[in-house]
Amino acid sequence: MSVSKKPMVLVILDGYGYREEQQDNAILNAKTPVMDALWAKRPHTLIDASGLEVGLPDRQMGNSEVGHVNLGAGRIVYQDLTRLDVEIKERTFFANPVLTNAVDQAKNAGKAVHIMGLLSAGGVHSHEDHIMAMVELAAERGAEKIYLHAFLDGRDTPPRSAEASLKKFEDKFAALGKGRVASIVGRYYAMDRDNRWDRVEKAYDLMTLAQGEFQADTAVAGLQAAYARDENDEFVKATVIRAEGQADAAMEDGDTLIFMNFRADRAREITRAFVNADFDGFARKKVVNLNFVMLTEYAADIKTAVAYPPASLANTFGEWMAKNDKTQLRISETEKYAHVTFFFNGGVEEPFAGEERILINSPKVATYDLQPEMSSAELTEKLVAAIESGKYDTIICNYPNGDMVGHTGVMEAAIKAVEALDNCIEQVTKAVESVGGQLLITADHGNAEQMRDPATGQEHTAHTNLPVPLIYVGEKNVKAVEGGKLSDIAPTMLSLMGMEIPQEMTGKPLFIVE
């Protein structure tokens, strides 16, 4: 008979953040004798679950998807916006081989470098700072003909806010003594995602043929004319920018075109119009043989160069367990099942070898304040049985209550949710100790600790950017390390299991065995 395993259990209390003020704090207003005792007597620390520490922009609240990806990856997993910000700050962007080759190819052949993208500080589909860096890269590498095709936002930014952005770029080109804004058009045309090809065609013709409904000497003048026609940024009609005596910026064979949007959904259609030989969305008046670069991969079936391919996460916690012939269980309710499986595994849908999964149905209620305990009793029953079974080397469990009930904004319900969790943690702790296992209790982000917005006085239904607790329960004598983050959890678990930490994991163990 096989030896009974002493599992390493990770319990993720979703939306269970740490905040010392009791007011509007469902966690501190709940009766939680079990968690209180664990915090008082067991090794513990606070860890970051938001902002740069999880690969999001500075001070941005965490979320469950990002949280679980970081938990399972054992390294900070940067979102595209932050990844590019970091690359530009550290100047590795300026050495990106795909971008530099594309610029050099055009320069050496006496061809133009065209840059297109959403000129916006919105940071949702693109960021104008990234476009500015691309202009600088092209200029630094000696490109003489640099043409910017500006898509205007007004959707993730105020409806009439493009003027400052356009002026910034016109000033930049003036300072460089080369390059210019060659066209402006609203994102309504250039960034459609619903196969409204008549819109896309207008943006395509504007850039390929240098033909539009309107023409202006400068980008700012073109924008002001659009405002006079009562067009907000998003809806600015195709406008060619060319002063008298300036060369035409129409695209020619051999030119380079770099698309600086990082979000895929609204970048695909216009990219296909440029790249696909068999494109049939509209009859293209001019088909140009371009050296086309996508900033990120917009779709796997678009065959063209990608400056920043998707980061594949090798050796996540789940994969490392499988490689080491360990058994693992993932268990949660419907609401967070994808998080302990797909997201924790770094975006991999298929279970790894030795990975089992248990899904507990979340209750069928309109909103979870009506049943704040959710399915936690059944989840705990199954979790305890799994711990006691001796089958698993490691178990990952998520309790959704703090987050799902926190989102309702109903304080009394959130308190009940937290109290239900305390009862569950008591049973789980006893089960782990009875088999000589180890337990880490943490959260993926905050929520229930802030149930009212202090600024507005309204119910606070969103996540927070506050730290989350991390508690160790087990037989090892350990010392907690300060200053941790979610991506330190996987290395912590491996270290406590006495396993090697793969080199891809840059996180650090937060409990050191003494």
Swiss-Prot record:
Its EC number is 5.4.2.12. GO terms for molecular function: manganese ion binding; phosphoglycerate mutase activity. Pathway: Carbohydrate degradation; glycolysis; pyruvate from D-glyceraldehyde 3-phosphate: step 3/5. Keywords: Glycolysis, Isomerase, Manganese, Metal-binding. Mn(2+) 2 binds at D14, S64, D444, H445. One of its GO terms (cellular component) is cytosol. The active site is at S64. One of its GO terms (biological process) is glycolytic process. Substrate binds at H125, R155, D156, R187, R193, R263, A264, D265, R266, K336. Mn(2+) 1 binds at D403, H407, H463. Its cofactor is Mn(2+). It is an enzyme of class 5 (isomerase). Binds 2 manganese ions per subunit. Catalyzes the interconversion of 2-phosphoglycerate and 3-phosphoglycerate. HAMAP family: GpmI. PANTHER family: 2,3-BISPHOSPHOGLYCERATE-INDEPENDENT PHOSPHOGLYCERATE MUTASE (PTHR31637:SF0). This is 2,3-bisphosphoglycerate-independent phosphoglycerate mutase. The gene is gpmI.
